Amino acid sequence: MSSYSAQLREEQQAVSRAYDRLDALRAQARSRLDTVRAAGSHGSPTQRTERDSFATMYEDRLTQLRAVEDRLVFGRLDDVHGAHRYIGRIGLSDEDHEPILTDWRADAARPFYEATPSNHGDIVMRRHITLSFREVVGVEDEVLDVHSDQVGEASSNGTLTGEGALLASLNAKRTGKMTDIVATIQGEQDRIIRADLNQAVVVQGGPGTGKTAVALHRAAYLLYTHRRALQRSGVLVVGPSSTFLHYIDQVLPSLGETGVVSRTIADLIPGIIATAHDDPYAAKLKGERRMAKAIANAVAARERVPSHLPVIRINGFNVPMVRADIEQAIADAKRTRQPHNKARETFVRDMLSAMRNRYVERLDYEPEQAELNDVMQQLRMNDDLRKTLNLAWLPMTGEWLVDQLFAKPQQLRRFAPWLEERDIETLTRPKGSPFTVSDVPLLDEAMELLGPDPKAVARQKALDAKRAEEEQFAKDTLAQAGIGSGIVTSQMLVDNINGMDAELTAQRAAADREWTYGHIVVDEAQELTAMDWRMLIRRCPSRSFTIVGDVAQTSALGGTRSWRRMMDPLFGERNCQLNELTINYRNPKEVSQLASDFASSEGLYISTVNAVRGVPDSVKRLTLRDDSLIGDAVAQQTVELVRAYVSSDGTGRVAIIAPDDMLKPLRARVYAQLQDELDPKEFDRLDAQSSWDEQVTVCSTQTVKGLEYDAVMVVQPGRIEENAPSRIVAASDLYVAMTRPTQRLLILRTKDDEKLLKL
C-alpha cells in the first residue's frame, strides 16, 4: 500500500467515525420522534401540547442533520503537539462529550481559513479532505510551518500541494444550483464572513470573486455566533430575481441553517407580487429618494378642510360643521404622530366631540348623559357628516394611493412639483394598471405613512381578542395541571390551539410587512435605488447589513455607481465597512481579461481582479456575413457546446445571451437543431426541463445576473448595446454577459454588428 493510500485509509476512519455519530444522532432523534408520535392524541391537552412541542423539536433536528450529509468533513488542522482537529459542517461530539468534528464557524476553525506561513500560531499543517458521498477520495496538505516535520511527511506521502481542492471545485461542471464554498473559503473571504454583526459590511467585487458565497456564509456564521439575538428576529436575504433565489436556495440549508427569509424587492410586501417592469427611465424616476416626499404630499393632501361644510340636523336643531373645529381636529390628530389611518381615529373622535358641543351650545338647558349619548349615535350614523369627515381625512390603502398618483397627471404635478412634463407623461398610466417592481418601494412608503387599512385592523382586533381568550385558557390549563414553567409555556399551548406550533420565525416574518429583522443580506445590491434602500432600512432599524455587488455591473439607471455616495447617507461612514474582493474564481484568465479590458474602455469602474486559472481556447469569436446566417450558426454552435459541456447526469450549463427581440426565434431554432442532432432520449430529457433547471437556456442580459454557466454564447453584442437605455448601462450589461462562463465564452456576431461595438 502506498503512503498516499495509507493517508486515505487513516482519514477514512476519522470520517466514518463522524458519519457514524451523525447516523446515531439521526436515529436518536427519529426514535424519540416516533415515540412522541406513537402516543397519538391520548392524555390531557397539556400532555398533547408537550408531545407536539417535542415532536417539532425532533423534526427540526432531523432536518438539520439530513442537510449536512454531503461533505460532512472537509478539513483537518494539525498543531505543534501532534493533535488533529477535524473541521466540518456542524460540530459533533461523542457520548462522553469529546469533540469529533469542529463546526467551521467556531473560533477553533478559523485557522483553517486564515492561517498563513507567516501567521499560523500553533497550527503547523492544514489538510483538505475530499469526499465522494461518504468515501475519502483525496487529501491535500498545506504545510504552514516550514520547519516542522510535516514538510517531509507530506512530501513523501504525496499529499503536499497548494490549491488542488479549490481548483477542483472551480473546474467542476455547473449544476444549476450554487454550492457552498465552506471547504475552500479563502483568507480575504473569511475575514469578511466573520466581521462584526452591528454594522453594514459592503463587499465590492468583480465577477466570480465569490461575493454571493461570502454573503451567504456570513449569514450562516452570524446565525451560529449570534443565535440568541437572531433566532427571534430572523435574517432576510434579498436577491435580484426569483431565478437567482432558486439558484442559491440550497446553500444555507447545506450549512445547517434553514430559518432564513429569501425575497426579491418585487415580493417583499406580503400580498403583493409585482411582475411588470417600468421602462428604465420611469424606474429611475420612481427610485429617486424625493419620491418619498411625493408620497408624503399625497397623504397630507387627504388631511384638509373640505370646501363645502354641511349643516347637520340633530333633534330639530341645525348644527353646522365649523372650519375652525376641523382645523383643530386635524392639528390634534397630527400631533399624535400616528400613521394616517390610526390618527384618523383621533380626528373623528375630536370632530364628533366638537359637533356634540356645538349641539349643546344651542340648548337652553343642561342635557343629561343619555341625551348626549343619543346625539353621538346620531352623529355617527349621519351620512353627510360621514362623507365630510372622509373628505377631510380620507381612510386609504397604499395600493389606492399609488394607483391614484400615477393615474392622474394633475396629482403628479401637485405632489411631485420637480417633475418635468415629459417625466409626468412617462409616469402616467391607466387607473388599475398592474403594479410594477418599481412601485413596490412606493407602496411600502405609502403603507408606512398610512398604517394598516381600518377594515384590516378591525379584523385583527377580533383575532387578537380571540387569541387573548385562548391564552388565558392556556394559562388556566397549565395552572390546573400544576405546571408553571418548564418546556411547555402558555404561548406554546396557544400556538398548538391554532395549529402554529411548527411555524418558524422565517414564516412569520415573511407574512408581516412590519417585521424587523436582525440582519439583512443584499445581493446584486448595485441595482437598488434610493427608494429600495429606504424600504430595506425600515426592515432592519439596527442597520446590520451584508451588502454585496459590483458597481461595474450596474444596469439600473437609478442604481449605484459609487458605494460611498449611496451608503454613507444610509449608514454613516463609521458604521459602513467597505471591502473589496480581488480574486476571480469563476472565469478563465482569458475571459476575465477580455471582459475587463472592454469594461475599462467603456469607463466602468473595475475592481482589480486576478483570475486564478487559465483555460486554453476559452475565448472564441465567430463573425458572420449577414443576419440571415445567425439562426443556423447559433443553433449549430449550441449543439457543439452542449456536446462539450452538458451531461446526461444533469450537470453542465450553457447559456445563449441575445438581444430581447431575438430570444423567441433563437430558442425555437436552437431546440429544433438539438432535436435533429441529439439522441432522442437526451433531447427529450433536455426539452422536459423546467425553466428553473434547464441546462440549455436562451436569455437576456437581465436574467443572468449572479448566475454562472460552463459555456456562454453572446449573440450580436452591438445590438444589445444599441437597445440599452444608455451606453454605460449597455457596457454593464455586456460585462455581466461576458463574465458568466467558467470554461468557454463564444462571441457570435455579424460584420455589421462589429461596426456598432469594438469587442
PLM regions with names:
Residues 177, 181, 211-215, 291, ...:
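Phosphate/oxyanion-binding active-site loops and adjacent basic polyanion-contact surfaces
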Residues 9, 13, 64, 168-172, ...:
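Generic amphipathic alpha-helical segments used as scaffolds and interaction surfaces in large
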